[in-house]
Amino acid sequence: MSLKRPAKDQPNTFEFNSSSLDAANAIIAKYPEGKQQSAVMALLYIVQRQNNNWIPLAAMKYIAKFLNMPYIKVYEVATFYSMYNLSPVGKYFVQVCTTTPCMIRGANKLVEACKEKISEKEAELSNDKSCSWMEVECLGACVNAPMMQINDD
């Protein structure tokens, strides 16, 4: 696993579009008064869907203001969970599980194939910008090891 770092090239601003804003407000409305910050994970997911499957720093700051919470708390959540992408990903985003059961059953061969066919380094776009890959923690299907996921499938 590699350390998750935000992309070097970042947009200066972010704002929810109308459908994302409606979705965010609907989620926040489900939380009791004073507990709306608990919606941070759901709002990060909404941002990622709106922003071509990655979350820029400006969006994390936007969520922090939206939920009236410190930016660092949003950043901590976004960098902790592997489901949040902090840099642009390709139209085809390959995630390879490299935890013990998958490594024992050949995940290293999947990683090598990704390096050869997509990009030498994980989290980098392919030459045609259509694909990217990264190592992830358990995808919850150890019985099928080695396991990989493309986009949400």
Regions found by a protein language model. Name each.
Residues 1-153:
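Signature of N-terminal electron-transfer/Fe-S-associated modules in redox systems
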